[in-house]
Amino acid sequence: MAEFEQRFRIRAPTSFLSSSDRKMIHDAALEILETVGVRVHSANARKALKGAGALVTEGSVDVKFPKHVVKSLVAKAPKTFTLGGRTKEFDLPLDGTHSYYTTDGCGIAVWDAKTKSRRKPVLEDIRKTALIGDYLPYVSIYEPMVVANDMPERSHVIHGMKVAMENTQKHLLSESTTNSDEARAQIQMGAEVLGGIEEFRKRHYISAMLCTMSPLMLDGIATDAAMVWAENHCPIHITSMPQAGISGPVTLSGSVSMLHAETLSVICIMQAHAPGSPMIYGSVPTSMDPKTGSYMGGSPESTLLCAGAVEMARHIGIPNSTGGFGSGAKAPGIQASLENAVSAMTCAAVGGEVVNGLGVPDGSTLLTYEQFLIDHEIAGMVLKVFKGYPVTKDALATDLVKKVGIGGSYLAQMHTIKNMREIFMPMLWDSDPFDMWVKKGAKDPMARALEKVDEILKTHKPVPLDKSVSEKLGTIVKQFK
């Protein structure tokens, strides 16, 4: 366990917002909740909120949240907890000292590198990407990356989760749970993998996502499903996704305060329903193109919105996740890589704990295998930068500098041999001299990424589930109708 989670440890985060900025945003969110409220389309959620002191009017789905109710309910959410892997080796402590990276999910198309066109995703894409994610050292969490079009609409989520469980040992994130039955089926599957429901509830093997409907609305069926997850101690990624200027204020602080209000409302629901259930303050806010109103994922404004949400999660002491790889690029390449690098660096700088989005640009709709590998390379570089470096007697190497002296070489020194393994070794970037690069085919990063994908798929063998467990998962899938 220690070796895996240590690679994601980072230095203390910085801040774009001052403490007074954060207080103003928080106070604005509380005012929104108390005076405007949230439209809660779940009768179960409204009942739980009413019992906790929220203002629920008979015959209305709008709920208002007095400040003291919000404070009381948010205080019930745990400040730290661990996301479990299939085995404890891949456990991920959420304690504010790590930055983890997860694949994106629910892509509705796949980029074909040969034809430069799109195709429909299938279940095999989930198997392949789960296997690749299992192999890649900086992928911490796997989320089924596409919607499997070759599976029945009713059960494609369950099919995808089974394939994910069979092809990676890492923590799993369920993004697309659409109803309570899907949640129960996935919980049953997780319990089979871990050997029982109590172990499943204790380990937090699966976390689930609940997206708000900005501005200030919650879908009833999805909220009911999240309540089932919460009952079973599955961490809920509360994901608010306002588009500044369309479904949120165009000013960044305005959109952050509104998404903060939405997030607080969901924390209140889950803590009223299942006190002490683990919450993750998620956020994937974006900006708009002022000329067309279209989505601009990966813009500086989108990046700052994500950073602001991370800071507000830290303000209330809740673990966070955010969309650090949310490029709006329509294909793999320079735009996707540049936008993702800037966003990922920014999210890590402010203490992003779970950074979402590897491999699925164009507003989290397009799976591209080569961009998946490029994004992974970016994640590794970001982690290396924010891990920092030690300042110790050995690291300062003053005695060695005296020994080598002026004009000497450090290459053959034992100190160099011992410490050079700490240098970041890229999987895809080229560092050969020009002539050697040409001799090897003058391949660009995209070509090398595709070659690496083929190599991983041919050679990596994930640790399989016991045959009896796979059979039980298959039975659950067949019974899901």
Predicted segments with their positions:
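Catalytic-core signal marking the mid-to-C-terminal active-site face
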Residues: 2-4, 15-28, 36, 41-48, ...
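N-terminal small/glycine-rich loop or linker at the start of catalytic domains
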Residues: 4, 21-22, 30, 93-114, ...
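Short acidic (Asp/Glu) and glycine-rich catalytic loops that position anionic groups and cofactors
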Residues: 4-9, 50-57, 205, 243-244, ...
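Short beta-alpha connecting loops at secondary-structure transitions
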Residues: 10-14, 292-297, 325-332, 360-371
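Flexible, glycine/charged-enriched surface loops at secondary-structure junctions
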Residues: 39-46, 59-60, 140, 200-203, ...
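Glycine-rich, N-terminal phosphate-binding loop and its surrounding beta-alpha-beta segment
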Residues: 44-115
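Helix-rich catalytic cores of soluble enzyme domains
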Residues: 120-349, 353
